[in-house]
């Protein structure tokens, strides 16, 4: 039996970034699934766009004990400058860093189902400048800086069969006043002391008609306080509501639903479906916790249309989606995303 190569590498290019910082982005990811020989994994991702450099994501995970418990260290960094007119001449820069430590333990682990719990501690730092000087780009961030320290309790459940996959994710987050976390007493300003809940459900079902695969996903986030952007949720873009530009809405709370049918239209000689037509319906609604917050008006985004998915050589993947806005969100920009293309 030939042992699988533990070293993996892959490239990715898409336009899933905000046009404000350059929509088109590229990534390279390197991963080793048995770095020191005891099942530990290391992954490193580097990416950039016209205005973002670098996007870094480093994660090292080690198994602990005989019951598949894992401990992970993670570091993420996201530096960007505004590239879209008319603000590109202002030299607006932002740097965000997130440090994380997590423990994950599966209490049920079978071939057809899994239930796991996780506990994560994170510390985030963000700073903004205008022309090289500290600048309050985000209201409530004195001298352009804010810090958020949070504890997160996660629950994951997955059930698999030959016909379907059901996965549920729940995460409670608490912002604590530690490690210099930014506190604002005004309820209309973001606060690092908060409580929020994020829930996600996904259902993938194999239908008998034309071997169609139905993919549905729902996401909800609720918060008791106005949040800093690193804790908020985005509505609009490839993975929320297609047909709108990425980060059309950034809100404390949101509810999103996506339903997509993947119909095979080309099968290889080996009998593998490789090209799919994917009609979809997306909807998202976002709102702020406090009504007086700037940009607080609730907004609903709705779109329909279709995409093409092509799985080709050795796991390579290509997809192109066009989304038609059913609720118009006016923009005078001329990016591909503004024309519904992802």
Regions found by a protein language model. Give the residues of each.
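Outer-membrane beta-barrel initiation region
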Residues: 1-72, 109
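Repeated loop/turn-to-beta-strand initiation elements of outer-membrane beta-barrel proteins
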Residues: 7-9, 36-42, 66-72, 80-81, ...
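Transmembrane beta-barrel strands of outer-membrane/channel proteins
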Residues: 11-15, 28, 42-48, 73-79, ...
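C-terminal outer-membrane beta-barrel translocator/porin domains of Gram-negative envelope proteins
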Residues: 19, 127-275, 279-283, 287-289, ...
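Transmembrane beta-barrel architecture of outer-membrane proteins
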Residues: 25, 53-55, 96-100, 148-152, ...
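Outer-membrane beta-barrel "beta-signal"
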Residues: 30, 308-310, 336-342
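Residue-level signature of outer-membrane beta-barrel architecture
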Residues: 32-34, 62-64, 105-107, 157-159, ...
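Outer-membrane beta-barrel translocator/channel fold
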Residues: 75-99, 105-106, 129-131, 324-339
